């Protein structure tokens, strides 16, 4: 007696397709300079949670007066005691602080909140990118730009835009030197207790 093969109404993805599918996790961003434009705090916080879950130390450098809301991050499961926050006065100081953190080799993820900074000089981008690659770390730049505004610089390997629609968050690749632009990821999030 022979066993019948099960037929699925859709093709089963191959192992190659499964491993090449983009994911929003630290392992996808290590060794890269990543920019998240326009409202990327949630996306950066997801990376902090992923890094901490995998035992990777993280640091957050902020050059703006408002940053993430610590109680929200703690409620999501982040260990705030293991997340050093460096407050600086300008984007240039923030980039130097990120450079020192990466050079130490102690951090798997460094988030640099640049705010409305128009860009970073090429030499600084090159140094940050090289340090991220050398120490197998991810450097995530948070900027406040529209999708049609230019990137922070040419060394940015991945540029993502965040779009919100109610409690749906869509991450869309505007630039990706590994996969090409255009791919997107969708995530459903819950709001604060008063909005649920």
Language model features: what each stretch is:
Residues 55-123:
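Conserved inter-motif catalytic segment of the P-loop NTP-binding fold
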Residues 139-196:
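Phosphate-binding/switch region of NTP-binding enzymes
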Residues 106-149:
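A contiguous pocket-lining binding segment that forms or flanks enzyme active sites
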Residues 1-60, 75-80, 176-179, 193-196:
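Detector for small/aliphatic-rich hydrophobic stretches
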Residues 55-56, 79-82, 107, 135-138, ...:
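Short glycine-/polar-rich loops that comprise or flank the Walker A/P-loop
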Residues 48, 98-99, 129:
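Generic hydrophobic/aromatic pocket-lining and core-packing "Φ" positions
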Residues 35, 60, 85-87, 141, ...:
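Structural signal for conserved beta-strand scaffold positions within catalytic alpha/beta enzyme cores
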Residues 25, 128-130, 161-162:
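A generic local secondary-structure boundary/capping motif
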